[in-house]
Structure formats: C-alpha cells, structure tokens
Amino acid sequence: MPNAISQVRREIKHTGSMKAKIVILLYRLATMYRSRNPFYKLLGIPFVILNKLINECLFCVELPWQTRIGYGLRLYHPHCIVLNRGTVIGENCILRQGATIGSLTDSEGREGASPVIGNNVEFGAHVVVIGPVTLGDNVKIGAGTVVTKDLAAGQVVVGQPFRVLSTHREV
C-alpha cells in the first residue's frame, strides 16, 4: 500500500488541472473496493460513491472502479470521458476530452469484451475505441478517430475509417 500511495502522489503531481487531480484521486481511492483486504474494501465504499457522484455526475467523467488503469494516467480537459468497466489501460496513458472506450453489446443486450490498451498510449480529443480490440504500446490516435481493429505497437492513426500514418519504434 505505501508503494501505491507514492505512485498516486506522483501521478497527481504530474497531472495538470485541479479537476484532473480530483478525478484521478477519487478513481484511485474507489479502486480500494477491489481489494481482498476487508479493511481496504470497507474503506473504498465511500469513494465508490464519491467517484460516481463527483466524477460522473458533476464532471461527466466515467472511470468506474472496476476499470483497470495503470499509474501515470494524465487527463487533459477531463470532460465527457467514458470508459467501460471492463477496459484495461496500461501505464502513462493520456486521455483527452470526449474519449470513449468501451465494449459492444449483442442483440440480447449482453456486453462483449472491452479494449485492452498498452502503455504510453495517447488519445486525441473525441476518440472512440470500441469492441474487443488491443492497442499496442506507444500508439497515438488522432482527434475524432474511431478505432474498431487492433493496432500494433508504435502506430499513429487518424481519420474515419482510420488510416495508419506511421509506425514509430521506441529508441
């Protein structure tokens, strides 16, 4: 737990606006509800409620406590961001306003698989990532792009339907 506290402190320090700091802090505190430790689980209950009330109702940012997000998350202009509870996001990712990351439902209303996103992925404004897709590490997605297929590590994509602009490799 001390390691998690220092990571959250570092994460909040490197996030820009006060609104983004509040959103991330409430989300991280709400994730205590996932703990197997009964004390942390109990401690997480009020933060699950605050996450719902403040982040979703007041700030229009849906980061469910079930969503798995690595440390280093940065939110630029955190408004109208929607993440599905089954989504998995790696470390050091950037989300901008209007980002939607979620699953598809079938004709009977059953929820399908959610996206799995690597480390150091950057989302432009109003990006939509939908369905059982995997985004590799160091992917960059341009504003307004809809992603419905897997992206390899290092790809830069834009447009609808998206097209790959380049593939960069980590040096």
Roles of regions detected by a PLM:
Residues 166-170:
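Short beta-strand-to-coil "C-cap" segments at the C-terminal boundary of structured domains/repeats
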Residues 65, 70-71, 76-79, 84-85, ...:
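Left-handed beta-helix
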Residues 1-59, 171:
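Terminal amphipathic alpha-helical/low-complexity segments used for targeting or macromolecular assembly
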